[in-house]
C-alpha cells in the first residue's frame, strides 16, 4: 500500500529552493526538485477505499489562500532530514494542517503526533544540521493543497498527487431578505 500525505505543492518555488540548496554545502542526499513540497500532514499507508474517503473529506475543507515566508533552516535529527521553513507562519496554515490531520485520524491514519512544524525537506540522510549559510528568503504563495502518495521506483521515491483542491474561504451564508412588514400585515388581514 502506498504512503499518503497532504502537502502544499511548490511548482514555481521548487526550482529556486533546489538551486539555493545546490549553491552551498548542504548535508545529506538532495531531495529531487520534483519531490519538494511543504508538508501538511503525514498519514501513512492506506488502501484504495480509505483513499477515496480521505479525498471526499478533504474536498470539503475550506481555507483562504495565504503566504508563508521561508526564512530559516533546520534539521530533524531522528528523521535525518535537513529543511527550510518559516520562523513564523500564518494561523491559516496551522488550522489547515490540523484539519487535514484530523481527517486522517477519523480514518485510522496518521502517527498521532500533535505538534506541527511546517518545513520543506531539502535533503535526507543528513547526519548534521545545515551550516550557517545565508538565511533563506523565499515567499510561498499557497493557493492549493494536494493529497500525495509515495511511490517507490528503481530510480528512487516519487510523489504523485492523487487529488488537489484550491484554497478558498468558506462561503458566506446567503442573506435572506427580511419579510416586508406591510406584506405580513396584509396577509394577516385576509
Model features per residue range: what roles?
Residues 1-190:
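Histidine-dependent nucleotide/RNA phosphoesterase domain, centered on the 2H-phosphoesterase fold
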